[in-house]
Amino acid sequence: MNEKKPKPRRLAYGVDPKRPQRYSLRQARYDALAHDIDALAAEAARQGRRLSVLDIGAGGGASPLHLRARPNFAAIDLDGADRDRQYNVDESLYRRFFIADLTEGCPELASESYDVVICEQVLEHIHELRKPMETIGRLVKPGGKAFVGVPIFLPPLHLARRHLVPRLDRLVRSTRRRDHVQAFTLASVKAALLAYSKLSFVEARGFRIISGGILRPLEERRAWWAFNRWLGARIPAACIEVQIVLEKPAASQKA
């Protein structure tokens, strides 16, 4: 009698165990940044150098899973950082892993030491944004880039999330823990990043206007992913999540 072989584990984009859908819209942000960083690594390799990348607020380590599947990962020196080890991230995914608190400015990390800084799904958990955003800008080398991703609301829904939801929680005596302490719009997070990081705006791209539920089966189809990427590039402010790409002017531009 033949035993049934277990089905292989389904991974988002072939690499990410967080979601089983092949083209998961929730994980699309990591696929997008991996695509761009891989292109930067290819350019660095052509110039005979390596690309230094920092994944700050690394969480469960989604970024390296997507990056290491790319053809130019061998040209990347990838470091990770988080305030503690609560997520039990596989530190072997990184060249080095730092215990460093973004809210304290990450003094362990040298200024202008990374070609790329990734800060995905971190800032919405932080009350005071000035120092974390200043730190992102401080760590990027001249000519380097930052990829900053947060959930956002379409105005005026951010006001409901900020003011009405806490009142309703108190009214119904909800015990639900809400980890998000910020209610960003695209305009508000972009303005704060430009003011505090001192980096220049490159682009904003949105992910997921509507997803999950009865639409989740569509996330097995590349065409649905492509449509959402197209839509998110054109109306990022209407999306549930946004990724803002920033750049530090090269030293020659500052002169």
What are the functions of these language-model segments?
Residues M1-E112, V116, M133, G206-F207, ...:
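Conserved N-terminal segment of class I S-adenosyl-L-methionine
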Residues P8-Y23, Q27, H127-G137, K145-A250:
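S-adenosyl-L-methionine-dependent methyltransferase catalytic module, highlighting the catalytic core
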Residues A28, L51-G57, R70-I76, E91-Y94, ...:
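Short linear motifs at secondary-structure transitions and domain/linker junctions
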Residues G48, E124, F184:
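Residue-level signal for short amphipathic helical patches enriched in basic/charged
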Residues L93-R95, Q121, A183, I210-S211:
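Conserved short hydrophobic patches within well-ordered secondary structure
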Residues V116-V122:
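A short beta-strand submotif of the Rossmann-like class I SAM-dependent methyltransferase core
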